From Swiss-Prot:
Originating gene: PER66
Native organism: Arabidopsis thaliana (Mouse-ear cress)
The protein's enzyme class: oxidoreductase
Disulfide bonding pattern of the chain: C35-C114, C68-C73, C198-C230
Protein name, per record: Peroxidase 66
Domain of life: Eukaryota
Residues binding substrate, per UniProt: P161
């Protein structure tokens, strides 16, 4: 069916007209005049931290997800607890979030270059893009202009989707943040550079159900390997666990290939193969890395726009409100 140029432009303007004001407020060139070196400063900080600690990319990407999923992308995950309030970073799902120092370091440098200009929320969003790119993944232009939140509550971290969710629960959780089924499967691909402690998946390895000792959706040999990494002994190291795909330092589509082989570490990951709503997406990305990269960049922009505040502050210190 052919469309005239006039009709196409009309359709584009119609779409732009329904964009939420909070999303429209963001701009890829937001700091071009006020802090032109902002992205360079953040990139150099992230790159140096990654050279020192290869775990930084996975940690900062996870930080971005956990920040955006609570009150939107507002850097509330960075705030410290006080005597009267337990903050997000001390909520159970966030106890294992690490590498806050990287964001703090970037923010200190930005305050010297451009005082009270670049928000902590934008630093997290840009850093998340940078760690993906530095790990071999896609690049995208980060929309900027977020404001930093002043509220951070540990009890709200219960809204983060746990690794035990089934597909219906995952779909509902992501939909509450304006994300589609495809966005959910795509963003789950961030686990390609992830690591998990045993506590997040060991329920799949033993006494799984009344009828199965091991989760039947898991590759048996893979389950035995994980059992060795997570022995049920009193002297098991507190950091015992496993990477979430076999090329954990590289951002690629191996995560999806492993799901096809029954080697998804989390129950929520492997469940994506058992549901017709998500199976085709897993299969597509396992076969086409370029498609995964393209969709991941788009979904990250979409997640980064969630809950953006039109009013707020540009925090001077990442850990405290002004």
């Amino acid at each position: 069916m052919a469309f005239s140029k006039g009709l196409i432009f009309a359709m584009i303007f119609a779409v732009l007209a329904i964009v939420k004001p909070s999303e429209a407020a963001l701009d890829a060139h937001y700091y071009d005049q006020s802090c032109p070196a902002a992205e360079k400063i953040i990139l150099e900080t992230v790159r140096n931290a990654t050279l020192y600690d290869p775990k930084v990319p996975a940690r900062l990407l996870r930080m971005f997800f956990h920040d955006c999923f609570i009150r939107g992308c507002d850097a509330s995950i960075l705030l410290d607890s006080t005597r009267s309030n337990q903050a997000e970073k001390d909520g159970p799902p966030n106890i294992s979030v690490r590498s806050f120092y990287v964001i703090e370091d970037a923010k200190r440098k930005l305050e010297k270059a451009c005082p009270r200009t670049v928000s902590c929320a934008d630093v997290i969003a840009i850093a998340a893009r940078d760690v993906v790119t530095l790990s071999g993944g896609p690049y995208w232009s980060v929309l900027k202009g977020r404001k930093d939140g002043t509220i951070s509550r540990a009890n709200e971290t219960r809204n983060l989707p746990p690794p035990t969710f089934n597909v219906s629960q995952l779909i509902q959780s992501f939909a509450a943040r304006g994300l589609s089924v495809k966005d959910m499967v795509t963003l789950s691909g961030g686990h390609t550079i992830g690591f998990s402690h045993c506590s997040s998946f060991e329920s799949r390895l033993q006494n799984f159900s009344k009828f199965h000792d091991i989760d039947p959706s898991m590759n048996y040999a893979f389950a035995q390997t994980l059992k060795k990494k997570c022995p049920r002994t009193s002297n098991r190291g507190k950091n015992a666990g496993t990477v979430l795909d076999s090329t954990s330092s590289v951002f690629d589509n191996v995560y999806y290939k492993q799901i096809l082989s029954g080697k998804g570490v989390f129950g929520s990951d492997q469940a994506l193969l058992g549901d017709s709503r998500t199976k085709w997406i897993v299969e597509t990305f396992a076969q086409d890395q370029k498609a995964f990269f393209r969709e991941f960049a788009a979904s990250m922009v979409k997640l980064g726009n969630f809950g953006v505040k039109e009013t707020g502050q540009v925090r001077v210190n990442t850990r405290f409100v002004n």
